[in-house]
């Protein structure tokens, strides 16, 4: 929807005041007074209001809000939605620029101190809608628990200043967009997507301010207990569907076994409720009360090849419907995949998709999936279904404008294949799985014993304890001495306590840091909390130390054992039962995702798109050996070899890339020869490592990341 072009008369721009701020308690003030305050500005009668988080350096120098890079983005967005900056009141949640290194806690405290000033300022413009840019600003209107990554774009009605309710729509701050943000999620070239989202959100505020009715009306009905009324709701809805020739369908499911990880698996899920919607209204009915006639009515429209069916994630809903006796025929559309095709870097959950296009209040917060009664579940289901149907039109336009029709068709085809793969599952050989488990445990125990023996080596143990005492002393305990040396001595005394014999804990960050430093590894990079980091990418730069190599091998094998071996089958550890992914037929049913930003597939529960290969040096067997084919079947593997590089070679017509593929060369080895001219003279094992290393900058360049 486009706003009408306004008749332009240059307005008189007025400035806000600093009155009301509690500067004495503000962490950004100077001696109880605002430090270079930047007040709001705009016309005496603004159409609507923009509230940012706080002024930056350019704003402080010029004394005006939003005049730096963020301001230029806001101004560009206003031009895009055909609104003049001079017609909008622009201000910030805080008056003063946050000092360098300010924490979110300090920013929130400054916002609270400035809130009386902002309330007084906005009370001059009662009822005017607000675009709140950034989490700090949005939390001032929507509460401290508000998450900008989850709720950006949603409409809230708030009485902020005592003058009555006004519409507030939070959006991602332009500064976050300039850093590559999208308001949730990330990936290549996401700043463009973030800018589009900002424009959508500002346009919604703009249209509401001008009286255009774009609010999402909640036209829903539901039935939890009366079979007669439920059948009547279905009958009336089916009549509307046959007239409209399209509808949306959504399912709510549950799992009646203790395998909680299966709650979102179509292969195990059972129907709890089903929702149907046209663009005008939606219904939701409890599955347990549906009559056979009502089920036949639903089944008839699902099987009608002349009616368009809309789903948000049909990869899940369609297999669930199939398991309950329904056949889905004819055109099938998917709003999740459409959104992925048009906006690949944005979050694709239904609420975020809907709030991008509609002025709608959040409804997901009212019901947590899998919890609550039918009285809570069915309204949630009906809103989901109605949102799916109403998202169809704007998403169809977005896909067309993005020239993403073919991408969407490919995604739909892949989703159907992924749904079949999920339901069918993958057979796992229980005997081979047990062999892998024993082999992994043996190697892990051996590596742990080697590291443990090294810790208690005569030349290292004393240094290790001193380092460990220092690391542990950096975090004070209750009743600890203030003096650091005394605190270290206290920790050393605790280690010598005969009642509590000292144990080396290989999974403790402090123990690992102390051990590696005692071995001479110069670790120094710290986490945000001030601890020395032992992340994989940091340790890999010290892999020439044998202790580091042993630790990395231990961690990798422990992770693989848990993820690809032990989690596949249900196991009992003492009194505790850990349920595995495999069903009663020894099949696992991975959940496949075809809407990753790169276009590659992903899977979970368990991750199955890339079973790790054998590595004798790391003591790692071939984990795919436990995946088997049943008698009379064959196990087939496909690999789109270096597909991204081949596409780039074709699109760019780069002579270097074309020569590689036309002459059947290995692109990774060719790039490795450029970086390491002596690549071909190095040992085979070393060449394998270098070839793997070069893949990171290659794929970083392919997907728009840092090189």
Q: Can you say where each PLM-predicted feature lies in the sequence?
A:
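A polyanion-binding, active-site-adjacent surface
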Residues: 2-209
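Short hydrophobic beta-strand that contains or immediately precedes a catalytic carboxylate
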Residues: 49-51, 247-250, 311, 332-333, ...
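Conserved RNase H-like, two-metal-ion catalytic cores of nucleic-acid enzymes
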Residues: 58-59, 63-69, 74, 212-352, ...
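Short active-site oxyanion
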Residues: 64, 126-129, 303-309, 500-502, ...
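Catalytic phosphate/metal-binding cores of nucleic-acid and nucleotide-processing enzymes, i.e., regions
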Residues: 72, 135, 146, 156, ...
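Metal-dependent phosphoesterase core characteristic of DEDDh/y 3'-5' exonuclease domains
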Residues: 142-153, 168, 174-178, 271, ...
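Conserved "right-hand" nucleotidyltransferase catalytic core of DNA-directed polymerases
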Residues: 207-285, 357, 363, 370-619, ...
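Generic long, charged, amphipathic alpha-helical segments
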Residues: 663, 667-689
């Amino acid at each position: 929807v486009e706003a009408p072009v306004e008749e332009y008369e240059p307005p008189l721009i007025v400035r806000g005041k600093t009155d009301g701020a509690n500067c004495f308690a503000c962490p950004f003030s100077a001696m109880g007074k605002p430090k270079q305050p930047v007040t709001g500005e705009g016309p005496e009668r603004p159409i609507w209001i923009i509230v940012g988080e706080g002024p930056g350096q350019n704003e402080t120098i010029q004394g005006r809000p939003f005049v730096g890079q963020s301001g230029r983005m806001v101004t560009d967005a206003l031009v895009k939605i055909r609104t003049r900056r001079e017609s909008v009141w622009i201000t910030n949640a805080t008056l003063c620029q946050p000092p360098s290194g300010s924490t979110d806690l300090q920013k929130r405290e400054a916002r609270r101190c400035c809130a009386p000033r902002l309330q007084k300022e906005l009370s001059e413009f009662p009822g005017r809608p607000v675009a709140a840019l950034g989490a700090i600003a949005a939390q001032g209107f929507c509460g401290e628990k508000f998450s900008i990554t989850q709720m950006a774009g949603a409409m809230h009605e708030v009485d902020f200043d005592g003058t009555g309710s006004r519409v507030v729509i939070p959006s991602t701050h332009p500064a976050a967009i300039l850093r590559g943000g999208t308001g949730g999620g990330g990936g290549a070239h996401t700043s463009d997507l973030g800018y589009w989202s900002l424009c959508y959100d500002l346009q919604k505020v703009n249209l509401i301010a001008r009286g255009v009715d774009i609010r999402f009306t909640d036209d829903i009905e539901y039935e939890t207990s009366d079979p007669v009324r439920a059948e009547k709701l279905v009958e009336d809805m089916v009549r509307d569907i046959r007239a409209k020739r399209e509808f949306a369908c959504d399912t709510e499911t549950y799992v009646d076994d203790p395998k909680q990880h299966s709650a979102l698996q179509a292969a195990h899920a059972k129907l709890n409720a089903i929702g149907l919607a046209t663009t005008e209204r939606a219904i939701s009915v409890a599955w347990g009360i549906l009559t056979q006639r009502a089920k036949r009515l639903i089944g008839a429209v699902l099987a009608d090849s002349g009616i368009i069916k809309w789903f948000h994630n049909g990869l899940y809903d369609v297999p669930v419907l199939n398991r309950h006796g329904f056949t889905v025929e004819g055109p099938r559309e998917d709003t999740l995949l459409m959104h992925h095709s048009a906006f690949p870097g944005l979050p694709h959950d239904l609420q975020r998709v809907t709030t991008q296009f509609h002025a709608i209040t959040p409804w997901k917060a009212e019901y947590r999936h899998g919890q609550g009664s039918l009285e809570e579940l069915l309204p949630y289901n009906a809103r989901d279904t109605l949102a799916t149907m109403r998202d169809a039109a704007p998403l169809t336009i977005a896909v067309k404008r993005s020239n993403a029709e073919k991408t969407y068709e490919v995604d739909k085809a892949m989703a159907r294949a992924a749904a079949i793969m999920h339901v069918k599952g993958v057979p796992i050989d229980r005997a081979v799985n047990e062999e892998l488990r024993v082999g992994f445990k043996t190697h892990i125990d051996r590596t742990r014993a080697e590291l443990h023996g090294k810790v208690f080596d005569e030349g290292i143990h004393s240094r290790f304890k001193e380092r460990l005492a220092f690391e542990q002393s950096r975090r004070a305990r209750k009743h600890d001495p203030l003096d650091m040396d005394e605190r270290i001595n206290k920790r050393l005394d605790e280690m010598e306590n005969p009642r509590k014999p000292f144990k080396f804990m290989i999974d403790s960050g402090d123990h690992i840091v102390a051990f590696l430093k005692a071995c001479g590894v110069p670790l120094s990079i710290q986490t945000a909390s001030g601890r020395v980091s032992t992340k994989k990418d940091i340790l890999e730069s010290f892999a020439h130390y044998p202790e580091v190599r042993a630790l990395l091998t231990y961690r990798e094998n422990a992770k693989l054992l848990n993820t690809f071996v032990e989690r596949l089958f249900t196991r009992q550890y003492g009194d505790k039962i850990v349920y595995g992914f495999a069903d009663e037929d020894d099949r696992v049913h991975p959940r496949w995702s075809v809407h990753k930003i790169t276009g590659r597939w992903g899977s979970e529960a368990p991750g199955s798109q890339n079973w790790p290969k054998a590595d004798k040096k790391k003591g790692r067997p071939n984990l795919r050996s436990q995946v088997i084919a049943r008698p009379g079947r064959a196990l087939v593997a496909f690999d789109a070899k270096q597909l991204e590089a081949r596409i780039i070679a074709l699109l760019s017509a780069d002579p270097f890339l074309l020569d590689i593929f036309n002459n059947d060369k290995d692109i990774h080895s060719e790039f490795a020869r450029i970086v390491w001219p002596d690549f071909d003279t190095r040992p085979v094992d070393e060449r394998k490592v270098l070839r793997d290393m070069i893949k990171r900058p290659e794929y970083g360049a392919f997907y728009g990341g840092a090189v």
